[in-house]
């Protein structure tokens, strides 16, 4: 089983990256996967554009955003990220997306 690389891109001041990290860690334990988790601090709008940052937190597994379709987006922004959720919106990605991305990467 391979060891996936998980990047959690965030900026100081947005509180959701810790919850996103906890989500990734919880799902990794469930799947018995040991990802390399890197926290990537995005310092400003210029870095946001360079890193193709869709907001904080952005979770990527092996370079791909866990949100389906997000890799095609171009609305890079230095702001908190809002994810579509079953009941409105959430400040972290859907657990199913994270599970799917980690499973695929570890295979």
For each of these PLM feature ranges, what is it?
Residues 46-52:
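Acidic pyrophosphate-coordinating catalytic loop
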Residues 1-31:
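Local sequence-structure signature of Cys/Sec-based thiol-disulfide redox active-site neighborhoods
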Residues 52-60, 72-77:
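Structural micro-motif
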Residues 34-46:
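Thiol-based oxidoreductase modules, predominantly thioredoxin-like and allied folds used
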Residues 64-106:
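Non-catalytic, surface beta->alpha helical segment in thiol-disulfide oxidoreductase systems
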Residues 38-41, 57-61:
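Short, well-ordered secondary-structure micro-motifs within conserved domains or adaptor modules
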């Amino acid at each position: 089983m391979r060891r996936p690389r998980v990047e959690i891109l965030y900026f100081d001041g947005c509180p959701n990256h810790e919850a996103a990290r906890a989500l990734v860690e919880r799902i990794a334990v469930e799947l018995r996967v040991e990802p390399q988790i890197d926290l990537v601090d995005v310092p400003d709008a210029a870095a946001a554009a360079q890193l193709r940052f869709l907001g904080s937190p952005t979770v990527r597994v092996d370079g791909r955003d866990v949100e389906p379709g997000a890799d095609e987006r171009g609305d890079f922004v230095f702001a908190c990220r809002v994810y579509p959720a079953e009941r409105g919106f959430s400040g972290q990605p859907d657990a199913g997306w994270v599970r799917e991305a980690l499973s695929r990467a570890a295979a």
